[in-house]
């Protein structure tokens, strides 16, 4: 986190490399980098929206189950983690409206709890159209969650509950429960 070594701009986050070429590295991210990435994302969304409209497809909401948990902080107090975590944590209110679930559904540290609540909100929303994932295997994992927890998901949709056995942080559970309603017609 030492200033003016790799960039003259203040570092706001470090992307952590995968380590596929050796030791994991921390790559500095600045406000300027985030601004450029945001523009690229906006352009990508524009192309995707345009293509969907041209093909007569409805534009809807996206299911994404990626964690927004940072890995840790440097000795200088700067957060670091995967680039997707950094991007998701930096999203403004407008971007967050793309999700079929509340942004807080990405907060659980426990992956089963996070995937479950994201799927729960997705199953309750008829506007769900897209599954976003960093890797194709995640789609198969979501299918496994659907199969494994089908009865609990249906019960929660019908009753407006969130399974008590999920390892959710109390404040996250409270926030999500306030945003969740029973939808018996979706459970039928």
Regions found by a protein language model. Give the residues of each.
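Active-site phosphate/ATP/adenylate-binding loop shared across adenylate-forming ligases
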Residues: 1-188
